[in-house]
């Protein structure tokens, strides 16, 4: 009784409700005092726990008491309170013993949505606990999504092998392939041809083309269709002094982005009199133009190798180099067991060729073809190039980036040691002022992508390096390690870096890069979480007002990185203002960011803004080139692709996609030295992030199945009572359909159960003869459900 009175009377600091409850000793009649009392008690337990931790006192009695409150919360639809209480006491793994069939979905949903707001290692603990619960209740597709988020290969393998249901395994293989994880399958799975197709991503081109057929967009588009020159003001038409080779190169890029993955166009894959577009460009332009074949035929390896083959015998070295890069682009994101890319690109004639472009193209091609694969054989090929100090910095740096992409997020110690040793080497230190050094740093940073505190080892090593490049490298490494986590403390650290005023001295260049990377880091870390994104966008406004030129240059890029393929009015209107900035570098980066924001969306407002910019900058070659690139990005895949690294209902961050985006943005910090200079082929790193934004439904034999789905704006239903609708403002469409950013689909047809928890990408449907209900969905993975269906038939 005193405990209950303590709730209404007395000093809150004294925690009397808890004090008298602990003196009672009995925990039987807790619920009889009502919900308000239990919540008050939970609040005081949290406060007392902190007090005792600070005073280093025993806390076992508090833990026992809180565990007796959990069943009450769960039985009264207060799952959030139960999770919060156990989280406060750092014993979240205890929740598994209190759950049942009815309570676990809501508890897991709340736990998973909390992860973005937690710090390391608590976020990992939450994901592992939720994973364990899903496995216990046979929700394997939900479990494997969490295993993918944890980047734990052993967990992923265990989930995949936890069932003998072939269709379910194939669905999980689709989820693994979407994250570009290369798993070694078991012997019996290897014999299942269909399963291997799912795991290696080789079925994507087929379904992508069937989507194109459905939407009636198989006809290739020409750059002129995108530029719509007749809509640009005629004021500059007669006055342009654009170098035609440069203009043709821009058209080659636009053509490759717009027709990406469709395997047909009117410029490169043509026979007869017109001849391919390559001959209309010159020097380095030939390299990028030939490489665009890989983008056009993306993932369609058998056909692609055939088409690219003739270019490998060309007499011009630039065209040969382009063909090698095209092979890398073609194989990006698919896995072929015969390893054609490795055989062709690691051939000594190409890797040790006399001219630099061929070597660079081979190295970059290997990085793109095997991104995320952790393939050990590539260490023997690329590590010597990183370690050889006599080589040109460009080659070693590109090899470092390729290794960073191949072993992204694996913290592979062989690669990190090799790059760190190279950075410390006395011979190399003389060359570290080279513009390519930033890619050496990036290669090291990518190894620790998403590894959080594991990066501290490398940061300590970098403190020992006495060179201006050491600081930018450590900033890059730490932002990659915390990418997508939304960690507030890291964001504050980066804002402090941007606050520093750089003094004029020898180290100025390094310090300028530190600030530029810090700005990119702000959006890379805040990416995964919406509140953080809004806060950072506001900070970018301040940085543009008060920052030095090196910071102002990076802000538009960071704005593009925070919302790729998600054109928000507030973002692209701001970028549109920056695109007329007095500082030409800022304007160029803002234009590229506009392309990034609208990539693959064909947003009409953005298209109009870019057309206006094309006529405004008709005399400025560099800026006009960038406007064309942005127009190409906007029409990527004829409006069917996305560059956003988040997938599976925006839960999972694809490391490979984010790494590719970051590589392009790092080169854009000094656009005039790289992309606007001779190294425009660096734009092709975007291919790692390109993926069709479709929903294709398949039957259990993996044949396309047309069903009706509702597509609408996703609604957050965490912690809401009952079974609220998870989409709003929906329209009914028949599959295959396109999903814009922030949209979600629900099945309308009750005859089928989706085997995946989220309707996105490739989804297998299982037919049931009794009407669908949420309980049935839960048992979809259960083999007993299939016998029930057969019996009903």
Show which residues each predicted segment covers.
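Long internal repeat-built scaffold domains in very large eukaryotic proteins
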Residues: 1-317, 330-354, 372-793
């Amino acid at each position: 009784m005193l405990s209950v009175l303590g709730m209404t009377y007395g000093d809150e600091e004294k925690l009397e409700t808890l004090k008298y409850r602990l003196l009672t000793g009995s925990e039987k009649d807790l619920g009889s005092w009502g919900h308000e009392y239990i919540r008050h008690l939970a609040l005081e337990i949290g406060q007392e726990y902190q007090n005792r931790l600070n005073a280093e006192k025993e806390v076992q009695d508090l833990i026992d008491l809180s565990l007796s409150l959990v069943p009450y919360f769960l039985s009264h639809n207060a799952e959030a309170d139960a999770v919060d209480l156990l989280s406060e006491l750092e014993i979240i793994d205890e929740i598994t013993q209190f759950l049942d069939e009815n309570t676990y979905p809501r508890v897991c949903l709340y736990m998973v949505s909390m992860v973005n707001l937690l710090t390391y290692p608590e976020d990992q603990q939450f994901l592992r606990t939720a994973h364990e619960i899903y496995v216990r209740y046979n929700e394997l597709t939900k479990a494997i999504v969490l295993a993918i988020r944890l980047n734990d290969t052993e967990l992923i393998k265990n989930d995949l092998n936890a069932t003998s249901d072939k269709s379910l395994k194939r669905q999980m293989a689709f989820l693994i392939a979407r994250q570009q994880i290369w798993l070694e399958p078991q012997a019996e799975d290897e014999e299942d041809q269909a399963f291997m197709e799912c795991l290696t991503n080789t079925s994507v081109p087929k379904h992508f083309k069937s989507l194109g057929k459905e939407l009636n967009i198989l006809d290739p588009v020409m750059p002129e269709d995108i530029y719509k020159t007749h809509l640009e003001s005629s004021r500059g038409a007669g006055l342009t002094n654009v170098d035609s080779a440069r203009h043709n190169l821009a058209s080659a890029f636009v053509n490759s982005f717009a027709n990406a993955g469709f395997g047909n166009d009117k410029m490169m894959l043509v026979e007869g009199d017109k001849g391919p577009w390559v001959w209309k460009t010159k020097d380095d332009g030939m390299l990028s133009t030939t490489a665009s074949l890989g983008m056009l035929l993306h993932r369609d390896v058998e056909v692609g190798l055939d088409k690219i083959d003739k270019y490998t015998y060309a007499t011009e070295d630039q065209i040969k180099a382009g063909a090698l890069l095209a092979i890398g682009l073609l194989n990006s994101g698919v896995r072929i067991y015969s390893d054609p890319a490795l055989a062709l690109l690691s051939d000594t004639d190409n890797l040790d060729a006399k001219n630099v472009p061929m070597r660079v193209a081979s190295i970059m091609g290997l990085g793109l073809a095997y991104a995320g694969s952790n393939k050990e054989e590539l260490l023997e090929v690329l590590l010597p190039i990183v370690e050889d100090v006599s080589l040109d910095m460009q080659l070693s740096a590109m090899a470092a980036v390729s290794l960073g992409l191949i072993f992204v997020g694996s913290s592979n110690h062989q690669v990190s040691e090799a790059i760190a040793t190279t950075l410390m080497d006395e011979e190399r230190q003389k060359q570290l002022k080279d513009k390519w050094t930033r890619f050496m740093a990036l290669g090291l940073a990518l190894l620790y992508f998403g590894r959080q505190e594991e990066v501290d080892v490398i940061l300590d090593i970098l403190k020992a390096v006495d060179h201006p490049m050491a600081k930018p490298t450590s900033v890059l490494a730490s932002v990659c390690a915390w990418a997508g986590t939304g960690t507030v403390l890291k964001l504050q650290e980066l804002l402090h870096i941007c606050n520093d005023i750089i003094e004029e001295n020898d180290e100025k260049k390094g310090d300028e890069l530190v600030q530029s990377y810090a700005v990119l880091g702000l959006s890379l870390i805040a990416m995964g979480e919406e509140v953080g994104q809004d806060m950072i966008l506001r900070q970018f406004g301040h940085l543009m007002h008060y920052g030095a030129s090196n910071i102002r240059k990076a802000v538009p890029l960071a704005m593009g990185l925070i919302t790729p393929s998600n054109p928000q009015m507030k973002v692209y209107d701001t970028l549109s203002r920056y695109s007329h900035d007095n500082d030409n570098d800022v304007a160029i980066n803002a234009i590229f960011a506009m392309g990034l924001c609208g990539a693959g969306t064909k947003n009409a407002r953005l298209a109009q803004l870019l057309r206006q910019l094309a006529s405004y900058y008709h005399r400025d070659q560099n800026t006009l080139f960038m406007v064309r690139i942005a127009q190409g990005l906007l029409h990527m895949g004829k409006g069917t692709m996305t560059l956003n690294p988040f997938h599976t209902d925006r839960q999972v961050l694809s490391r490979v996609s984010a790494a590719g985006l970051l590589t392009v943005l790092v080169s854009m910090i000094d656009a005039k030295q790289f992309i606007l200079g001779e190294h425009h082929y660096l734009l092709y790193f975007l291919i790692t992030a390109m993926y069709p934004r479709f929903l294709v439904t398949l039957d259990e034999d993996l044949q396309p199945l047309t069903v009706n789905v509702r597509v609408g704006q996703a609604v957050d239903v965490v912690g809401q009572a009952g079974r609220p609708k998870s989409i709003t403002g929906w329209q009914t469409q028949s599959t295959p359909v396109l999903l814009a950013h922030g949209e979600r689909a629900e099945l309308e047809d009750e005859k089928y159960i989706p085997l995946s928890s989220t309707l996105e990408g490739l989804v297998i449907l299982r037919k049931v003869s009794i009407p669908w209900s949420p309980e049935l969905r839960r048992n979809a993975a259960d083999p007993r459900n299939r016998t029930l269906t057969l019996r009903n038939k």
